[in-house]
């Protein structure tokens, strides 16, 4: 058996008698400590009886700080007593010393046990007095008026403990008070009880007749009793003690001598025995195997890894209890290596091995489970945990390990799988939950991939693919492990658990129920503010009004200007994290924050704008921002901040009284605009509005030249490196800025790759364009802007002049507006301060500008804003969009109409429908619209045909916008066949196509020609070594270590490339692989956080460079150099800058962009 600690001798623990081993195992489980090999050897030396007395003393102790030390202490005292007994020293003199235990109070045993003779009295109904020798106890065995005294030797244990000390059961006949006899066969697995007269002794004793009122003093160490409650008692091989035996034991213990509570005689079993249980009382634990119970000592991350490596194998068939316990004290890296060698390699691919084992404890750990149908069964494969830098609100409240991201896989087959097949198999999974060890996870929430992911999904022709952007989340609701308590969801149904986040039961429809509840899945940063001290107040929405001052209505609902916008006081804004982009903090302080507010059961979504007029600690929200209202009957429940939940969970404090969790979660903030690109929709709308094609061809030529020059020109190289910075941690930009020449092999390889990506984007109409910006939206706090005016705040403050404004993915001819950017006096001084980058819309006029553009609002959407003079010169706007097609009103199911079990089934069924029968209306409408637009821009159409096409396009626009909102409204959207095109332009890459000469067709052809020309003349990038890194020497031990690690990486990466996993999962695993080796190099997440000596880090980084590049030079393939830069890149850049440039300056990469 593998043991990571101790000497060679300690790695072979002493063998204990089965009963002693079983009792020790029980104590280890109860105390959550391992005794260790040395303590076991001490017990083995004592013999069975002495070891039993020691373990009883441990069990009687109120607190045990260190189990191994306590056992060794008691074992030495027991051995001393035994030696004194052998010399004839009275045991009464030694007993108090033995039982006193260590001097520390928490490890003291307060129960004194006396070896001298003490008479215990039990008044029987016949008024007879029963007497026995020292420390005897009496238990009724046959008749209510007759007792049998049981002699408990010296400091011997209670029946609860002593009942386990019978390794083998000898044949024994005992005379009962009524004259009956009973026998028990030797070595039987279970002992039948219930007969009035049964007692068992060790094989070492002879069979004997026993008087009904006394037991010979020789019957001292081995004893079992019968229970009038349970029909069967397991043999000593069983780990846990039957509850009825525990009850008898507890009562007998009170007779053993003076203790914490005074002794009392026993005349009968209590009517309702109370079981003192140290474990969670549920079905999972009751049916648990010893292996499942032993897992608790490992901690959840190790437990998860065990089940991930077992795949679908049963733990009982693979692992022993001793082996599981031997893993407890291993580091994560040692643990992973051990279980991989022992069993993991048999059941999972090497590419599925856990990576990044020593990650920062503060990083998010995402646990995955893939559920798939194989034949007639459903299998569950656990994967991860994967490391991320942001958390959802759900993960923060319940904890990372209590959330499972579950992927329900489609069947791989040539024929389409019927939806009923998925329902038949997967509904059962939702009903039973997903069991992981002694934990049960149940369906909680799901979320589709959003607009972009929907469009991507619909581009894939294979409708029966295995993966999906629809994400399903299960949460842990039950556990049989003590380590899992206290837990905030304990004792709650799934419905009650959801109410912690928001009073979702008040959702008006079933469709809105899950769409609103999915707000807890946004990746957010928690605003560290005490919401109990914050004044959250509602203010009215600003209505749209006509020229006569009347409120404008649509479908009997008033139109509003301020849909999704709120305000926040300056002091709270200053406490907000600095600007956020993709979970990373940027500077300076933001002007706008997109957020989710969970407050006293309500759920609020939108943006807040800094407003200096507000008193401190104030947040103003509007009715349009409130997605779920506080339930009137639950408005007075106890609410706590989410930060308090985290603190209480870490401190293992009870969370059972919490009824609602308050939290202000920041999704994103207004940031400096990044490089702006066009899109196919935007180009066609601009051309339709009069912008000449030649202008876009000029932009195209400039973009192609920039991509071509990226490998040779520093300016173009830095521009393209920053454009793709998120792809590789800005490593190419770091290399360039540190002075590494563009000719460096790996840098050339990366620049060439980014240029290829640039050309692919160009083919799709993604062309860089100057003087255009993407800005977050809100409304004018001053109320001074007119209906056609906006306020645009850029780098240098407010901009004045005409601008084009568009909201992606708008398709209507009038979705691009020409507006006047207007200066608002004293805006910075009296209202928003001097933060930047936003567009403010007016709150005047008969209709909101956001509603006119793609049916939008102001809850954090990003708008395209252009002050490009060429576009402004030629573009002529069209009339704004007005909805013509109204959605068909369908009867919506309400959550309030269902009981909880029916509601859960309906919600999961909706998930299955979203997952396996998705609507393709969105993609169909967009593709048909683009094909019609292509005809408008190329063909010489007469007015009648042009008008007919435009009418079809307007209908498609309405259906497209309806399909965007379908998940929230619950409306079904179908595209009529007469609106679908039969042929598509060639640049769309569809099967039935024609060659288009439109601007999009020309852009595609030009980029395609360049790509073809390059592929014919491509030259492989050779591998050359920079002397700066080759001259640095490192100790041979370091070189040997990293040589080994690199070979290990090559093996793992090869497996990853061969693994049958989707691209997202493969990228995630590669990232974890690199993080693992970075941590080995830096002892931290990054070079900037390392506590190691910089010289040592530089030496090892150069060794990594040398090993990797020398191997890559053999194949002359620069793509094989990536490991050096992905692992040691930051250290190498720093070293190069110091070595070659001398003086350096600290610079902000976002600022350089």
From Swiss-Prot:
Keywords: Nucleotidyltransferase, RNA-binding, RNA-directed RNA polymerase, RNA-mediated gene silencing, Transferase. Coiled coil: none annotated. GO terms for biological process: siRNA processing. GO terms for cellular component: nuclear RNA-directed RNA polymerase complex. It catalyses: RNA(n) + a ribonucleoside 5'-triphosphate = RNA(n+1) + diphosphate. Its EC number is 2.7.7.48. Expressed in shoot apical meristem (SAM) and panicles. It comes from the Eukaryota. GO terms for molecular function: RNA binding; RNA-directed RNA polymerase activity. It is an enzyme of class 2 (transferase). This is Probable RNA-dependent RNA polymerase 3. It comes from Oryza sativa subsp. japonica. The lineage of its organism: Eukaryota, Viridiplantae, Streptophyta, Embryophyta, Tracheophyta.
């Amino acid at each position: 058996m593998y043991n990571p600690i101790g000497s060679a001798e300690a790695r072979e623990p002493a063998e204990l008698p089965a009963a002693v081993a079983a009792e020790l195992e029980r104590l280890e489980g109860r105390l959550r400590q391992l005794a260790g090999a040395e303590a076991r050897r001490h017990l083995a030396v004592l013999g069975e009886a002495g070891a039993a007395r020691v373990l009883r003393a441990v069990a009687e102790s109120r607190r045990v700080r260190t189990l191994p030390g306590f056992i060794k202490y008691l074992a030495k005292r027991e051995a001393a007593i035994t030696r004194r007994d052998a010399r004839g020293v009275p045991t009464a003199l030694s007993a108090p010393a033995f039982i006193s235990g260590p001097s520390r109070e928490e490890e003291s045993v307060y129960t004194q046990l006396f070896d001298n003779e003490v008479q215990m009295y039990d008044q029987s109904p016949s008024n007879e007095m029963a007497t026995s020798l020292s420390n005897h106890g009496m238990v009724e065995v046959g008749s209510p008026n007759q007792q049998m005294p049981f002699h408990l030797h010296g400091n011997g244990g209670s029946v609860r403990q002593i009942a386990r000390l019978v390794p083998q059961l000898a044949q024994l006949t005992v005379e009962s008070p009524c004259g009956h006899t009973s026998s028990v066969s030797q070595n039987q697995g279970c002992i039948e009880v219930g007969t009035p007269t049964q007692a068992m002794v060790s094989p070492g004793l002879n069979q004997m007749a026993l008087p009904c009122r006394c037991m010979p003093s020789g019957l001292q160490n081995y004893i079992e009793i019968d229970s009038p409650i349970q029909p069967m008692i397991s043999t000593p091989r069983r780990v846990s003690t039957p509850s009825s035996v525990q009850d008898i034991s507890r009562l007998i213990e009170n007779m053993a001598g003076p203790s914490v509570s005074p002794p009392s005689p026993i005349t009968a079993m209590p009517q309702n025995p109370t079981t003192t249980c140290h474990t969670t009382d549920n079905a999972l634990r009751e049916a648990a195997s010893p292996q499942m119970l032993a897992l608790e000592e490992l901690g959840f991350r190790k437990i998860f890894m065990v089940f991930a490596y077992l795949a679908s194998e049963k733990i009982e068939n693979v692992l022993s209890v001793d082996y599981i316990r031997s893993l407890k004290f291993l580091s994560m890296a040692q643990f992973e290596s051990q279980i991989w060698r022992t069993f993991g390699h048999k059941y999972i691919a090497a590419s599925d091995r856990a990576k990044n084992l020593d990650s920062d404890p503060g990083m998010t750990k995402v646990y995955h489970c893939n559920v798939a149908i194989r034949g007639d069964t459903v299998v569950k494969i656990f994967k991860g945990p994967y490391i991320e830098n942001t958390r959802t609100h759900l993960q923060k409240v319940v904890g990372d390990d209590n959330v499972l991201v579950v992927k329900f896989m489609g069947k791989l087959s040539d024929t389409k799988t019927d939806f009923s097949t998925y329902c038949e198999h997967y509904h059962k999974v939702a009903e039973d939950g997903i069991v992981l060890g002694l934990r049960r996870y149940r369906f909680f929430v799901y979320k589709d991939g959003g607009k972009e992911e929907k469009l991507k999904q619909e581009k894939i022709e294979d409708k029966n693919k295995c993966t999906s952007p629809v994400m399903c989340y299960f949460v842990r609701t039950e556990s049989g492990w003590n380590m899992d308590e206290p837990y905030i969801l304990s004792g709650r149904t799934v419905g009650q658990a959801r109410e912690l986040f928001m009073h979702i039961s008040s959702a008006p429809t079933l469709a809105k129920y899950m769409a609103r509840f999915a707000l807890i899945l946004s990746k957010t940063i928690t605003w560290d503010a005490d919401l109990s001290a914050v004044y959250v107040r509602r203010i009215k929405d600003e209505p749209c009004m006509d020229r006569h001052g009347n409120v404008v209505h649509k479908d009997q609902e008033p139109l509003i200007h301020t849909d999704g916008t709120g305000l926040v006081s300056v002091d709270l804004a200053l406490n907000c994290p600095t600007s956020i982009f993709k979970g990373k903090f940027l500077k300076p302080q933001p002007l706008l924050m997109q957020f989710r507010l969970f407050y006293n059961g309500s759920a609020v979504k939108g943006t807040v704008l800094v407003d200096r007029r507000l008193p401190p600690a104030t947040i103003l929200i509007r009715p349009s921002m409130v997605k779920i209202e506080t339930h009137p009957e639950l408005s007075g429940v106890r609410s706590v901040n989410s930060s308090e939940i985290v603190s209480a969970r870490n401190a293992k404090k009870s969370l059972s009284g919490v009824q609602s969790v308050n939290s202000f979660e920041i999704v994103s903030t207004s940031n400096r605009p990044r490089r702006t690109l066009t899109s196919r929709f935007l180009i066609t709308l601009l051309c339709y509005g009069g912008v000449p094609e030649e202008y876009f061809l000029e932009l195209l030529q400039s973009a192609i030249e920039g991509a071509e020059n990226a490998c040779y020109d520093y300016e173009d190289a830095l521009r393209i490196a920053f454009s793709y910075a998120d792809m590789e941690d800005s490593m190419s930009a770091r290399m360039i800025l540190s002075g590494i020449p563009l000719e460096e092999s790996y840098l050339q390889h990366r620049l060439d790759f980014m240029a290829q990506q640039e050309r692919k984007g160009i083919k799709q109409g993604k062309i860089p364009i100057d003087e255009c910006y993407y800005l977050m939206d809100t409304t004018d706090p001053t109320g001074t802007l007119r209906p056609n005016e906006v306020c645009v705040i850029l780098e240098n403050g407010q901009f004045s002049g005409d601008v084009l404004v568009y909201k992606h993915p708008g398709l209507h001819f009038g979705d691009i507006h020409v507006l006047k950017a207007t200066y608002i006096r004293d805006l910075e001084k009296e209202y928003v301060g001097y933060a930047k980058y936003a567009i403010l819309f007016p709150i005047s006029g008969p209709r909101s500008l956001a509603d006119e553009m793609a049916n939008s609002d102001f809850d954090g959407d990003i708008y395209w804003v252009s002050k490009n003079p060429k576009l402004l010169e030629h573009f002529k706007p069209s009339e704004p969009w007005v909805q013509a097609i109204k959605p068909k009103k369908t009867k919506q199911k309400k959550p309030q109409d269902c009981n909880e079990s029916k509601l859960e089934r309906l919600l999961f069924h909706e998930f299955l429908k979203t997952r396996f029968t998705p609507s393709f209306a969105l993609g169909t409408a967009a593709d048909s619209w683009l094909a019609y637009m292509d005809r408008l821009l190329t063909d010489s159409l007469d007015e009648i045909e042009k008008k007919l096409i435009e009418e079809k396009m307007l209908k498609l626009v309405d259906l497209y916008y309806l399909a965007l909102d379908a998940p929230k409204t619950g409306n079904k959207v179908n595209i009529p066949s007469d609106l679908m095109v039969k042929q598509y332009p060639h640049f769309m890459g569809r099967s039935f196509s024609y060659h288009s000469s439109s601007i999009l067709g020309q852009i595609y052809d030009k980029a395609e020609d360049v790509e073809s020309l390059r592929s014919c003349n491509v030259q492989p990038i050779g591998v050359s070594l920079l002397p700066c890194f080759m001259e640095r020497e490192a100790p041979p031990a370091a070189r040997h270590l990293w040589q080994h690690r690199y070979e290990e990486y090559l093996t793992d990466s090869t497996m990853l490339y061969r693994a049958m996993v989707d691209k997202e999962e493969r990228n995630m695993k590669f990232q974890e692989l690199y993080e693992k080796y970075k941590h080995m190099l830096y002892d931290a997440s990054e070079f900037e956080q390392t506590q190691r000596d910089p010289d040592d880090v530089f030496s090892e980084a150069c060794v990594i460079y040398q090993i990797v590049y020398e191997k890559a030079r053999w194949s002359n393939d620069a793509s094989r150099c990536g490991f050096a830069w992905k692992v040691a890149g930051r250290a190498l850049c720093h070293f190069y800058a110091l070595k070659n440039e001398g003086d350096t300056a600290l610079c902000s990469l976002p600022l350089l962009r």
